[in-house]
């Protein structure tokens, strides 16, 4: 593979910015008020989630990144801008919509176990004014980027009309648009370069229950043809990542003890986009993404993988595993 350590592609991310809050503690008793655990909080940390985690992953890989999204005029929005500034990301293209709620997901981790999550959010679609500002920003700056990533968490930023406008404009400027999809209406992503649904999402979108290689092939072709994609991809969790252009192949995942899958989809999207921007072919890009995801799931919380971590991880793998390129779907 091409050495990516000195690569810095310019990538534009558009989507739902989320705040991820982690409360860490321990638990050694049951509440007298109800049959629930009492967690003694020892520390907390707040990180970028959703499209923000895609941005964070790209920065960790060495990309130059900008983000387009919509925030409100609340304290969470101020916090979000601060987190982006902390990693050197420009907030010039964040549209402020009055009374817009920035989603915040709070997780309690007790003795290294994820106990509960509670959310503060709104899934209401952004207004027409915000959509028009995003289109204006996008059309003004798209020529400066190598690639576009759309991170849809179903929180109202990527409306159907806006998403189609972005994809069509990206094509007009000869820029690949990669999408991490959400929901059942995949026609909003029609014409994208590729989508990154997991097996469950792909089954729902294609209306094909995936349970073997035959049904996987049917579903992945259906997605490519129906939604006019350049490539069709389905992530298969422990079974790897399936790709279809003119033929099906499955790149296996690499063995690692899984601590937390939070944000693994963000890592797949970010690392695929990064590798493709650095002139990787799709198979090499998927292999790179599998390695990046392997690093991330070995950590707790919305995490990232650096180029050096990925190189070290690949080096640590058993030789027979690292040389196995493709395995059949199981």
What are these model-derived regions, one by one?
Residues 16-17, 153, 267:
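Active-site metal-binding loops of divalent metal-dependent hydrolases
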């Amino acid at each position: 593979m091409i050495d990516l350590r000195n690569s810095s592609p310019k990538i534009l991310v558009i989507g739902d910015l989320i705040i991820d809050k982690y409360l860490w503690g321990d638990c050694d008793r049951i509440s007298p008020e109800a049959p629930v655990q009492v967690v003694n909080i020892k520390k907390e940390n707040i990180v970028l989630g959703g499209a923000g985690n895609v941005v964070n992953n790209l920065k960790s890989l060495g990309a130059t990144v900008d983000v387009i999204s919509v925030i409100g005029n609340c304290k969470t929005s101020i916090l979000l801008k601060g987190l982006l500034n902390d990693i050197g990301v420009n907030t010039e293209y964040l549209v402020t919509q009055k009374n817009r709620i920035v989603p915040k997901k709070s997780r309690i981790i007790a003795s290294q176990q994820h106990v509960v999550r509670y959310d503060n959010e709104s899934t209401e679609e952004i207004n027409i004014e915000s959509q028009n500002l995003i289109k204006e920003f996008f059309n003004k700056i798209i020529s400066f980027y190598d690639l576009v990533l759309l991170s849809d968490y179903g929180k109202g930023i990527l409306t159907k009309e806006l998403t189609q406008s972005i994809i069509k404009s990206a094509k007009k400027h000869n820029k690949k648009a990669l999408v991490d999809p959400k929901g059942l209406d995949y026609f909003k992503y029609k014409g994208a370069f590729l989508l990154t649904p997991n097996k469950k999402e792909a089954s729902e979108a294609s209306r094909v229950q995936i349970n073997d290689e035959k049904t996987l092939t049917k579903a992945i072709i259906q997605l490519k043809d129906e939604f006019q994609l350049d490539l069709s991809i389905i992530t298969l969790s422990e079974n790897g990542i399936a790709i279809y252009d003119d033929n099906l192949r499955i790149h296996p995942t690499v063995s690692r003890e899984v601590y937390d899958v939070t944000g693994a989809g963000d890592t797949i999207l970010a690392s695929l986009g990064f590798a493709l921007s650095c002139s990787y072919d799709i198979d090499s890009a998927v292999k790179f993404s599998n390695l990046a995801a392997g690093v991330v799931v070995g950590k707790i919380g919305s995490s990232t993988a650096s180029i050096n971590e990925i190189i070290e991880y690949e080096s640590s793998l058993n030789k027979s595993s690292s040389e196995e390129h493709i395995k059949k779907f199981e």
